[in-house]
């Protein structure tokens, strides 16, 4: 199994990236919480990975930290939570935010995530509550330091708003809802990544 990749970042199109590792291009899907930590295209980066094998495709998911990957693996063990929904959850909340929502049984926060209904949220509470007690330990689930989101070059024909809407749709939001979310936080000076971050923050 591929557990880690290090190479040159060739393309960034939220939530996907293309990573060149010794001449081989790997397509990876990243939660937005990891996407925000990526360097500019053309630079070296390292991602921790998890491979999902399906009948119709092999999907490679990438994460900026092992902690993010650990939570992803815990999520997909939960009944009714597949990789796509796990990606949406990790895009909407950081590991700490999700852990606290679970430990405090904040059902109202969980159901705001696209694809998470009341039953799924309740199942997450039942199956994951108590698994985050290590948060009190300094060497477990340590929050990554704040990283400024780098500016990125927009695609030739797509505006940052278009890219942000497309990314939100890929994360499970319906197109009209995604467009409304982006419009609400739109600012001419924001990159697509910043728009996505603000839209997800406002949704919660």
From Swiss-Prot:
Annotated region described as Domain II, given as residue ranges: 65-143
InterPro entries: DNA_helicase_Holl-junc_RuvA_I, Hlx-hairpin-Hlx_DNA-bd_motif, NA-bd_OB-fold, RuvA, RuvA_2-like, RuvA_C, RuvA_C_sf
GO terms, molecular function: ATP binding; four-way junction DNA binding; four-way junction helicase activity
GO cellular component assignments: cytoplasm; Holliday junction helicase complex; Holliday junction resolvase complex
Region named Domain I: 1-64
Flexible linker as annotated region, ranges: 144-155
GO biological process: DNA recombination; DNA repair
Keywords: Cytoplasm, DNA damage, DNA recombination, DNA repair, DNA-binding
Presence of the UniProt keyword Aminoacyl-tRNA synthetase in the record: no
Localisation per UniProt entry: Cytoplasm
Database matches in Pfam families: HHH_5, RuvA_C, RuvA_N
Domain of life: Bacteria
SMART domains noted in UniProt: HhH1
Chain positions covered by the region annotation Domain III: 156-204
Assembly, per entry: Homotetramer. Forms an RuvA(8)-RuvB(12)-Holliday junction (HJ) complex. HJ DNA is sandwiched between 2 RuvA tetramers; dsDNA enters through RuvA and exits via RuvB. An RuvB hexamer assembles on each DNA strand where it exits the tetramer. Each RuvB hexamer is contacted by two RuvA subunits (via domain III) on 2 adjacent RuvB subunits; this complex drives branch migration. In the full resolvosome a probable DNA-RuvA(4)-RuvB(12)-RuvC(2) complex forms which resolves the HJ.
Domain notes: Has three domains with a flexible linker between the domains II and III and assumes an 'L' shape. Domain III is highly mobile and contacts RuvB.
Entry's family note: Belongs to the RuvA family.
Function text: The RuvA-RuvB-RuvC complex processes Holliday junction (HJ) DNA during genetic recombination and DNA repair, while the RuvA-RuvB complex plays an important role in the rescue of blocked DNA replication forks via replication fork reversal (RFR). RuvA specifically binds to HJ cruciform DNA, conferring on it an open structure. The RuvB hexamer acts as an ATP-dependent pump, pulling dsDNA into and through the RuvAB complex. HJ branch migration allows RuvC to scan DNA until it finds its consensus sequence, where it cleaves and resolves the cruciform DNA.
Protein name, per record: Holliday junction branch migration complex subunit RuvA
Species assigned in the record: Actinobacillus succinogenes (strain ATCC 55618 / DSM 22257 / CCUG 43843 / 130Z)
Gene name in the database record: ruvA
